[in-house]
Amino acid sequence: MVLLFGAATLIALALQTMLPYWLPIGPYVPDLVLILAVDLGLRHHGAIAALMAFVMGYAIDAFSGTQIGLNAFMITLVFLLTYEMSSRLLVTNVVVGILAVFAGVLIKDLGSIAISSGFGGLGQRGLMADLFGQAAITALIAPLVFLALARSKKLLGLLTPGRREDNTPARRWLK
């Protein structure tokens, strides 16, 4: 599992870095690493998953060159909130994942802005429109990333029967 999410994080970081050069999408670059953190929070509970979320956030910090630790903190916070939400719900399906990704992007970006530039930067109307646009695009891409992760886990034999991520016929409600 660690190697799968490590490779997925590197691919996500490469795509997030290159997408603005390939496509004219401006500020609407999907946050693929956050989708991975939400998947960790929904389906993998334990200290290793929390450590992986922190390392994924720290990798964003290393690639972006911004304040070291800010993205690590925000990605870990989104992971913990998603973990708490999934432990309280009976069913964690794609719709719950999409909503968690949308809220996670808003929490991460608003928290990063509030910490790095103070709360005065949150009142700009154009900024809020861009944040909601990025959250919507990231939420729309989330099911594809969840599907790719589930197929990769199945291909590598990482699914254990009876777990939340198991999609056997006896557990059809998870689709």
Where are these regions (language model features)?
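Terminal, non-globular segments
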Residues: 1-175
